[in-house]
């Protein structure tokens, strides 16, 4: 599973294209949802901005295109993140970034923390269980293992960045 493919080979270009498409979908969905990155949950992505974030992503796609396990993991996680972004992007765009953030924060403040955390963990643990099952039952096959790993990675990312946003919101003074 740790085998690399030769840079410039057919397999390399397959994994490179897969990464470019999946990372591109993540970028597109993020741009539609939050063109000014007001709602971006990843502090590093927010700090890098669109220009540097795009450049670093292109470089990383070129590097990880030679490592199938990483390429499939990153690709799986990226398309799941893009799908999640697209789910609410229309609402974010129609309300505007600032108004959506204010609306979301108000909903959080009106919801009991235990209910919110239960729903978040319900969503992410159920998602991770699908990935975990793929990992567990995959045997020696690279593709289902990497897809399962990507699903678990997605669930962990959603949990981490959602809890990070929740922590920031709860420590900020109420307006």
What are the roles of these predicted feature ranges?
Residues 1-175:
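Charge-biased, low-complexity intrinsically disordered regions
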